[in-house]
UniProtKB/Swiss-Prot annotation:
Subunit structure: Monomer. Homodimer. Homooligomer. Self-interaction correlates with nuclear localization and efficient activation of transcription. Monomers suppress local silencing by interacting with and inactivating host adenosine kinase 2 (ADK2) in the cytoplasm. Interacts with and inhibits host SNF1 kinase. Binds to ssDNA.
Keyword Zinc-finger among record annotations: yes
Species per Swiss-Prot/TrEMBL record: Tomato yellow leaf curl Sardinia virus (isolate Spain-2)
Protein name (record): Transcriptional activator protein
Family, similarity comment: Belongs to the geminiviridae transcriptional activator protein family.
ZnF endpoints (unnamed): 37-54
PTM (free text): Phosphorylated.
Annotated motif Nuclear localization signal, positions: 17-32
Protein keywords: Activator, DNA-binding, Host cytoplasm, Host nucleus, Host-virus interaction, Inhibition of host innate immune response by virus, Metal-binding, Phosphoprotein, Suppressor of RNA silencing, Viral immunoevasion, Zinc, Zinc-finger
Role: Strong activator of the late viral genes promoters. Acts as a suppressor of RNA-mediated gene silencing, also known as post-transcriptional gene silencing (PTGS), a mechanism of plant viral defense that limits the accumulation of viral RNAs. TrAP suppresses the host RNA silencing by inhibiting adenosine kinase 2 (ADK2), a kinase involved in a general methylation pathway. Also suppresses the host basal defense by interacting with and inhibiting SNF1 kinase, a key regulator of cell metabolism implicated in innate antiviral defense. Determines pathogenicity.
A Gene Ontology cellular-component term: host cell nucleus
C-alpha cells in the first residue's frame, strides 16, 4: 500500500525521548584545568586555539598560544631549542591595570542620536507621545 503523504522521504524519525536518552549516555570528552586562583574549568578535547580572560589573567587552551603569553624563565620560549622566528623575539608589553572597573560615559542632556534628525520635537502632542510609548 502506498502512502498518501506527498513527501518522497518516508524514513521514520527517532523520537525526541530516544535522542535525549542516547545523548545522556554519551560521555563528553573534556579535561579539567585548575587555575591558580582556585577556580577550575573544563575544556573539550577537540577545542583548540581558544583563550579567555578570568580575573584579569589571560588563559590559553593551546600550547601555541601559551608561547606568546608566558614571559618568565618557565616559558617554552626559553626552553625550546628550535630556532624561533624573529617575531617572537620582539618584547610584548603588558600593562598591569590595578583598577579593573571601566568608567561609564556620563549622561548628556542633549538630543539622543535617534531623535537628532526629527524636526520640531517641542511640537509633539500628548497623543503623539502616547503613541510612541505604545510602540
Amino acid at each position: 500500500m502506498q502512502s498518501s503523504s506527498p513527501s518522497t522521504s518516508h524514513c521514520s524519525q527517532i523520537p525526541i525521548k530516544i535522542q535525549h536518552h542516547i545523548a545522556k549516555k554519551r560521555q563528553v570528552r573534556r579535561r579539567r584545568v585548575d587555575l591558580d586562583c582556585g577556580c577550575s574549568y573544563y575544556i573539550h578535547l577537540d577545542c583548540i586555539n581558544h583563550g579567555f580572560t578570568h580575573r584579569g589573567v589571560h588563559h590559553c587552551a593551546s600550547s601555541n598560544e601559551w608561547r606568546l603569553y608566558l614571559r618568565d624563565n618557565k616559558s617554552p620560549i626559553f626552553h625550546d631549542n628550535q630556532t624561533q622566528p624573529t617575531t617572537i623575539q620582539q618584547q610584548i608589553q603588558f600593562t598591569n591595570i590595578s583598577n579593573q572597573v571601566q568608567p561609564q560615559l556620563e549622561e548628556g542632556t542633549g538630543d539622543s542620536q535617534m531623535f537628532s534628525q526629527l524636526p520640531h520635537l517641542d511640537d509633539l502632542t500628548v497623543s503623539d507621545w502616547s503613541f510612541f510609548k505604545s510602540l
